[in-house]
């Protein structure tokens, strides 16, 4: 019956103190150096390069975001100024239009008044002429009537 105790273990086992255990330890250390030189250092270098690339990209992205925010602020200011300028131009155009309307209305009113006054003077002149003509005709008729009356006598 095999015993389960270490003291009673047969030779050639894992915990024998012959050259196997130190040889395995040397193999592990040697494998560690080889893996370190062939795998871990290149992978570590690639990881560091990638980390540097990511950090650089993030820094550039932050810089570009700051530039974009600055440009956005400037463009908003320019847009605000343009809107104010447009409102000012519109207001000036409305005022100019109102002034032109008032001037045109005043000119039309003055022309209408002048035309009305001219027509009134012409009517007065024609009325005076008609009255003078009627007076002359009345005088002529009166003279004619008097002559005929005197001629009958």
Swiss-Prot record:
**Which UniProt key words apply to this protein?**
ATP synthesis, CF(0), Hydrogen ion transport, Ion transport, Membrane, Thylakoid, Transmembrane, Transmembrane helix, Transport
Domain of life per record? Bacteria
Single GO MF annotation? proton-transporting ATP synthase activity, rotational mechanism
> What Gene3D superfamilies does the record point to?
F1F0 ATP synthase subunit B, membrane domain
**Described purpose of this protein according to its UniProt entry:** F(1)F(0) ATP synthase produces ATP from ADP in the presence of a proton or sodium gradient. F-type ATPases consist of two structural domains, F(1) containing the extramembraneous catalytic core and F(0) containing the membrane proton channel, linked together by a central stalk and a peripheral stalk. During catalysis, ATP synthesis in the catalytic domain of F(1) is coupled via a rotary mechanism of the central stalk subunits to proton translocation.
State the oligomer form and interacting partners: F-type ATPases have 2 components, F(1) - the catalytic core - and F(0) - the membrane proton channel. F(1) has five subunits: alpha(3), beta(3), gamma(1), delta(1), epsilon(1). F(0) has four main subunits: a(1), b(1), b'(1) and c(10-14). The alpha and beta chains form an alternating ring which encloses part of the gamma chain. F(1) is attached to F(0) by a central stalk formed by the gamma and epsilon chains, while a peripheral stalk is formed by the delta, b and b' chains.
- Which family, according to the similarity comment? Belongs to the ATPase B chain family.
What this protein is called in its record is ATP synthase subunit b'
Output the lineage of the source organism.
Bacteria, Bacillati, Cyanobacteriota, Cyanophyceae, Synechococcales
Gene assigned in the entry: atpF2
């Amino acid at each position: 019956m095999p015993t389960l105790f270490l003291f009673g273990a047969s030779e050639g086992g894992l915990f024998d103190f012959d050259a196997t255990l130190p040889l395995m330890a040397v193999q592990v250390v040697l494998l560690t150096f080889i893996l370190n030189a062939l795998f871990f250092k290149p992978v570590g270098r690639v990881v560091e390069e990638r980390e540097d690339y990511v950090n650089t990209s993030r820094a550039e992205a932050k810089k570009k975001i700051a530039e974009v925010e600055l440009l956005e602020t400037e463009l908003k200011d320019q847009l605000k100024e343009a809107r104010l300028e447009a409102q000012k131009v519109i207001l000036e155009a409305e005022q100019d239009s109102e002034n032109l309307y008032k001037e045109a209305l005043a000119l039309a009113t003055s022309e209408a008044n002048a035309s009305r006054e001219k027509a009134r003077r012409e009517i007065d002149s024609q009325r005076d002429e008609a009255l003078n003509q009627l007076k002359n005709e009345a005088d002529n008729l009166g003279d004619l009537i008097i002559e005929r009356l005197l001629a009958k006598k």
